[in-house]
Amino acid sequence: MKHPNTIDIKALQSSFQIIGLLGKPRHDVTLQMHKNLFQWLLEKGYQVLVERPIGEQLGLSENYLASVDEIGQQAQLAIVIGGDGNVLGRARTLAKYDIALIGINRGNLGFLTDIDPKNAYSQLQACLEDGDCFVEERFILEASVERNGKIIARGNAVNEAVVHPAKIAHMIDFHVYINDKFAFSQRSDGLIISTPTGSTAYSLSAGGPILTPQLNAIALVPMFPHTLSSRPLVIDGDSKISIRFAEYNTSQLEVGCDSQVALEFSPDDIVHIQKSPDKLRLLHLKNYNYYKVLSSKLGWLRNSV
């Protein structure tokens, strides 16, 4: 049975004419993979757009270079080479476009990168030419800062939005409202608001629950709360979360989106977090198994008896 969060790959596969190649290489060997994959895709007959900084390093001509937004506007598939951080950074931009995304893992855990670099070409060929893959839609979060009735800052998060003081080792006092109804007050180092995708990231480190990607749910996970009764809270994914702050808090507060974008605000402001209208579309290999990924990445594997 087809899951409602998946997309018909046959219809999408036929549209794969322009492919974007993205990712920030840490080492020369990764840059070599960009070069080899670029040539391989050209030989397969695809039109290829390369993220501008990478293309310039490779010495490609201008007609192959594009920004992340331009790739989102023109391409049907984005291939990101790197770790989850690379995928997160590109995904926040690409989510507003009608484009699928798949990652080649050059990082550590690689929860968002399906392709093994050792088998990259055979796996991509099976996906692009044989259709041995599927697209899964995942929701992302939108964080906004309200000041005097106006939104002054806005950002998207694939994994999580984190409310915290700008200085480390400082506690803050805040009140959380869900759908305009008071939920709880807390004194802690901050609050992690996580998507199912982000439940295996920062939220997991703070003792939050693992949410399977298909769940329409958001996890609220406290960071070092100053009470023994505080526990993570899982709420409906369509909820609107509003956070108000005590006036005596430090004047420098932030909402961090995927630990890559920071929205600064003051104690008089209100932070709103809710599901974004944009969606991330991840392209998975046909044999993708989320529970196998969990077991492998989190060390749950044991020898069978």
Curated annotation (Swiss-Prot):
Gene Ontology molecular functions: ATP binding; metal ion binding; NAD binding; NAD+ kinase activity
Cofactor(s) of this protein: a divalent metal cation
Keywords: ATP-binding, Cytoplasm, Kinase, NAD, NADP, Nucleotide-binding, Transferase
Coiled-coil segments on the chain, per record: none
CC terms in the record's Gene Ontology section: cytoplasm
Catalysed transformations (reactions): NAD(+) + ATP = ADP + NADP(+) + H(+)
Highest taxon, organism lineage: Bacteria
Pfam families, sorted: NAD_kinase (PF01513), NAD_kinase_C (PF20143)
InterPro entries: ATP-NAD_kinase_N (IPR017438), ATP-NAD_kinase_PpnK-typ_C (IPR017437), NAD/diacylglycerol_kinase_sf (IPR016064), NADK (IPR002504)
EC number(s) on file: 2.7.1.23
Residues forming the catalytic site: D84 (proton acceptor)
Annotated binding of NAD(+), by residue: D84, G85, N159, E160, H170, R187, D189, T200, A201, Y202, S203, L204, S205, Q260
Gene3D superfamilies attached to this UniProt entry: Probable inorganic polyphosphate/atp-NAD kinase, domain 1, Probable inorganic polyphosphate/atp-NAD kinase, domain 2
Biological processes annotated in GO: NAD metabolic process; NADP biosynthetic process
Subcellular location: Cytoplasm
Chief place of localization: cytoplasm
Similarity comment: family membership: Belongs to the NAD kinase family.
HAMAP family: NAD_kinase (MF_00361)
Role according to the record: Involved in the regulation of the intracellular balance of NAD and NADP, and is a key enzyme in the biosynthesis of NADP. Catalyzes specifically the phosphorylation on 2'-hydroxyl of the adenosine moiety of NAD to yield NADP.
Protein name per Swiss-Prot or TrEMBL: NAD kinase
Source organism of this protein record: Pasteurella multocida (strain Pm70)
Gene: nadK
